[in-house]
Amino acid sequence: TKRIQSILKNRIFDAVMDFLCYSDKDTADSFKFYSQYTKQYFFISSCAVYNTSLGGIFKEDSPKVLPVWDYSINKWASEKKLVELATGTDVKYTIIRPCVTYGDTRIPYGIVPQYGYHWTLIARVLNGKPIVRWNEGNNRCNMMRVEDFAVGVVGLIGNPMAYNEAFNICGDET
């Protein structure tokens, strides 16, 4: 940490993007460190913070937290911690809640191991094999390519309307 601080000394970045925090402690540590070096701190949360048991289309002010999923609980706790820490400082924060994102190197799907095996899903699709689906195939999931996510993020950097706000960034694929 000392070495990084010496390298970053006297540098201020337009934005820091935090993709790595999965708990309120992670968020507190990250914000305390990086907020010294940025004008706008981005926390990449997840649409998973919403209470999906309620159904429907979720907006930024929709009810939060499906209380049975640690990922949802922890991302929401992280958001609350960020707001608490940023309040009263000069650092502007922006919370981004993406839907499921995929790209050429990662295609998340619940039955596929997280890293290195996502092409097994694609192989099943290409070979006409069955794919396991939850809730008798009635579950819906919004997905978007990482490039589309990036377009949404770029529009928020340095944008005063994005300061101290949360945004859903979702694709048009369901």
Language model region names:
Residues 3, 15, 29, 81, ...:
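Alpha-helical elements of Rossmann-like donor-binding domains used by nucleotide-donor carbohydrate transfer enzymes
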Residues 3-11:
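Short amphipathic alpha-helix with an adjacent loop that forms part of the alpha/beta core around
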Residues 10-57, 66-69, 73-84:
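NAD(P)-cofactor binding segment of oxidoreductase domains
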Residues 17, 42, 94-96, 167:
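Hydrophobic/aromatic beta-strand patches that form the interior of the parallel beta-sheet core
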Residues 49, 101-103:
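Conserved sequence/active-site signature of Rossmann-fold short-chain dehydrogenase/reductase
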Residues 66-97, 104, 117, 126:
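Active-site Tyr-X1-5-Lys
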Residues 120-132, 139-174:
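Alpha-helical substrate-binding/gating segment
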